[in-house]
Swiss-Prot record:
UniProt family annotation: Belongs to the peptidase C26 family.
Tissue expression as described in the entry: Expressed in roots, in leaves, stems and siliques.
Organism, as annotated: Arabidopsis thaliana (Mouse-ear cress)
Domain Gamma-glutamyl hydrolase, chain residue ranges per copy: 45-341
Name of the protein described by the UniProt record: Gamma-glutamyl hydrolase 2
GO cellular component: extracellular space; plant-type cell wall; plant-type vacuole; vacuole
Domain of life: Eukaryota
Amino acid sequence: MWSYVWLPLVALSLFKDSIIMAKAATILLPSQTGFDISRSPVCSAPDPNLNYRPVIGILSHPGDGASGRLSNATDASSIAASYVKLAESGGARVIPLIFNEPEEILFQKLELVNGVILTGGWAKEGLYFEIVKKIFNKVLERNDAGEHFPIYAICLGFELLTMIISQNRDIFEKMDARNSASSLQFVENVNIQGTIFQRFPPELLKKLGTDCLVMQNHRFGISPQSFEGNIALSNFFKIVTTCVDDNGKVYVSTVQSTKYPVTGFQWHPEKNAFEWGSSKIPHSEDAIQVTQHAANHLVSEARKSLNRPESKKVLSNLIYNYKPTYCGYAGIGYDEVYIFTQQRSLL
């Protein structure tokens, strides 16, 4: 009896194999299609108005990035490797801008880059604040002179630019948004063209408003009312998104300059793909897409910069001249950081 059961199964298997073989037989070699394989492929000419070798400058922040666990040197500064990876994943290289090196050297390095990231952190006064202010003013000057030069101001970076533009260091209020993921609420009728969100797929834009796809980690924020109530701020930026903290207070979460390629984030676009120290960081496929689109937008803006510095100077100052330190074993904070304790002036 069992032989009769197996016969149909064998026949079915042979039938499937014959279908697969028939499909395989329809695959043609280039010589069978009439395609001239001796002809060289036609590649589109590069756009002369774009820079296909962009470099992003990232400003270092005071301290070792690990609360002194890695270095207690008084002159130490650091850059979390996630910011470097953000720029690199968009197709750029990185030059560290060491905040406490001689200003002459720092601003010569600024001439080697096509965009800047101002990172998260805690320093809101002293030399760091003054350097951020000077970099910001130089970036505006370069844009006013006709060079397209973007800034990504993330978390603390956004807070500092807000203080500088508003000329009010007390404009932020306490918020409860530490170590938590959130959605983003788009301002009604906001035009996202020219913003980080312009190339997001419609489905991802929709999910941003309903799912927790971005990481928040800050104790301060600015309400839309305070933001719009400051003439300097409302003239410079438009509010793109808001968020709600753990106590129900609404704060500004994404802004875009109406005149310059300057984007401000209260949230962290770099963490989803590149930080693992907190279980709250979203790592879903949608969350990773958010990080990738943020990287792509920054570098696409940097490609519009026609600054073409001497190659040797760029190579001598790239982040590749430094080694990151792994600190993820602590289970908190950053996974990797670049620590700078000596000025490296190789211009």
